Amino acid sequence: GLIVVDRAVHGKNQNYLTPENRVPEKPLPYPWESCIIAGGGWSYSFDAKYMSGREAIHTLVDIVAKGGNLLLNVAPSPEGEWDEGAYKLLNEIGNWMSVNKEAIYGTRSMAPFKFDNVCVTAKPDGSVYLTYLVEKGQTSLPTEIVFPDFKPKKSVKAQLLGTKQKLKWTQKEDGMVIQLPNDMSVKLLDTEAFVIKIK
């Protein structure tokens, strides 16, 4: 088959849109992929400054929660090598994905997409993922996360990905209230983002 992309304007004769170096504020009603420069430019730049792993992970999660794909450009040198900054960035992304890829691969957007510091994704099997974006320098976490207007079955469980930690939750009028354990806060603050799986 043939896939057609117009880099400038969405239209009836193309398959998906490619916002360049930006992320739409809300989900788009057609397939899309944000094309983001990791550092320097589209081609190799000497002494390029690369985005942090945290910035790249937050960008990825935000895009996926809005139903898009991320194309992250990492340009090689004339010798076909990457800078140390590029390797560091990709290693940080890889380490995070090794724990939390379940919240990214094979997921779809789900309203409200994002609330506070939390992005929402879901899978066809009913799994819902809340990814809390930890900001640089953040020193504390909320004691609870309120998933607005969400009313799960009483039998569902909430669990932190990468751990066996089950989280207590209650149902209130404004949504599902998930408790964050105090004894996990130091570990969670040391990550770029952590994921709560609801199923």
Regions picked out by a protein language model, each given a short descriptive name:
Residues 1-199:
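Mature catalytic domains of secreted/periplasmic carbohydrate-active enzymes
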